[in-house]
A protein has these predicted regions:
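Anchoring transmembrane alpha helix of integral membrane proteins
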Residues: 1-83, 87, 159, 170-171, ...
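Alpha-helical transmembrane segments and their immediate interhelical loop/hinge regions
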Residues: 4-6, 57-60, 146-270, 279-281
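Juxtamembrane membrane-interface segments in integral membrane proteins
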Residues: 8, 44-51, 57, 64, ...
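Alpha-helical transmembrane segments and their immediate boundary loops
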Residues: 23, 208-366
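Hydrophobic alpha-helical transmembrane segments of integral membrane proteins
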Residues: 27, 39-40, 75-76, 89-90, ...
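Alpha-helical transmembrane segments and their lipid-water interface positions
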Residues: 29, 33, 73-77, 104, ...
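Juxtamembrane helix-boundary/capping and inter-helix hinge elements in multi-pass membrane proteins
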Residues: 53-54, 194-199, 308-314
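Juxtamembrane/interfacial segments around transmembrane helices
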Residues: 56-69, 108-128, 211-224, 274-277, ...
């Protein structure tokens, strides 16, 4: 009964935590960003401490260096990115119209060339090409309208401005205190763990730390590289909004599959609209994106991230959808590290289950009976 009460208590505590996170999901992003930054920068602070600096001084040095780096990036990149984003939002309706015209023209051309041949063999009517073109145009128009509305709301809505301000103001403050009190917080949490299970929990925490640290630090470097690769590469080949597309794809590369799809779809769309019917710009843009994907899949991720996550792609997709539906964009960002932590706990639970009486079917001997037997043997 005691075990059942413990299981019920921890299950209830977990459900309560999930409920609270879901209720406050709208304000979690700056705090999650601060925790991630604190987690990534804490080893640097500890290294400075080993050189003789105290915790406060090391934290101030790290935060000042980080603020200087962000300031330089803001001066160099933010004005350019803002101009490109504003221009992209303005050009998006025109791009949609041009893309509709290109798709309609190509479908009509193909339907004329293959009329009486392939279309009739497939059992389609004479107007199948026009109907397909109309449906495709409607889909493109709807997607362009949705994307334009979303980007316009990002630029104009007060909520987006508040979120941006909270990221710029709240995140550095919380990160500073996280770095300053990191060891104290870890010690406090460790002291709250029941003594009977402390070593087990510590072992689990070490495995979770290995999985999460490997992913967060490795994937952050991958995102930095891909953002620079896409942004510089697409700009050099002459793609309009190349820097914006590259930086956006680099940031979204923290979410598996999303960054690569963003780079591929946006670069191909802009290249087709700007350069059709020539293939020169499209070929160069796709070469940049595919080369980045090759480097990520065969060199960067194996070297920097490795097998630290240990999740099957199906479970990875499930984690993205589940956390994204519960916590929005914050859930998408945290889905992989949290799923990695859940995987460690699940593997531990399976291992304990295989050692249990329920799995083996063997009843463990009564300790009192063992003690009596040992005493008889001693006599």
């Amino acid at each position: 009964m005691r075990v059942e009460l413990q299981v019920g208590f921890w299950a209830g505590a977990f459900l309560l935590l999930v409920l609270l996170l879901w209720l406050f999901s709208g304000v979690l992003l700056p705090f999650v960003a601060a925790v991630v930054l604190g987690y990534l920068l804490d080893p640097v602070v500890e290294r400075l401490e080993r050189f003789g600096m105290n915790r406060l001084g090391a934290t101030l040095v790290i935060m000042a260096s980080f603020a200087l780096l962000l300031t330089l990036l803001s001066i160099l990149l933010v004005p350019v990115l803002w101009r490109q984003l504003s221009s992209f939002v303005e050009a998006l309706p025109g791009y949609a119209v041009q893309l509709q015209g290109l798709i309609s023209g190509e479908i009509e051309r193909l339907s004329r060339e293959y009329s009486g041949g392939l279309i009739e063999k497939l059992g389609l009517g004479k107007d199948a090409g026009a109907e397909f073109a109309s449906a495709t145009n409607d889909l493109v128009a709807q997607a362009a309208h949705w994307a334009g509305s979303f980007l316009n709301s990002v630029l104009t809505r007060g909520a987006a401005l508040i979120n941006l301000i909270s990221l710029l103001v709240v995140t550095p403050v919380v990160t500073f205190y996280m770095l300053l009190d990191w060891d104290r917080m870890v010690a406090t949490i460790d002291g709250l763990v029941p003594m009977r299970h402390r070593e087990t929990v510590r072992e689990l925490a070490r495995e979770i730390h290995t999985a999460m640290a490997g992913f967060l630090r490795g994937q952050s470097l991958v995102c930095l590289f891909l953002g620079a690769w896409y942004g510089i590469g697409l700009s050099l080949v002459g793609l309009n909004f190349g820097l914006l597309i590259g930086i956006m794809a680099g940031i979204l590369s923290f979410i598996p599959y999303v960054g690569s799809l963003t780079a591929l779809i946006l670069s191909a769309t802009v290249a087709i609209v700007e350069d059709w019917p020539r293939w020169h710009l499209l070929t160069l843009s796709l070469a940049v994106v595919l080369a980045g994907q090759f480097l990520e899949g065969n060199i960067l991720s194996p070297k920097l991230v490795g097998e630290s996550v240990g999740l099957h792609p199906v479970w990875l997709l499930f984690a993205l959808l589940a956390f994204g539906s519960l916590f929005g964009f914050t859930g998408l960002i945290t889905a992989v590290p949290l799923a990695a932590a859940a995987g460690v706990v699940l593997r531990f639970a399976i291992a304990r289950y295989r050692e249990s009486e329920l799995y083996t079917g063997e009843t463990s001997p009564d300790p009192k009976l063992l003690l009596k037997t040992a005493r008889k043997e001693d006599r």
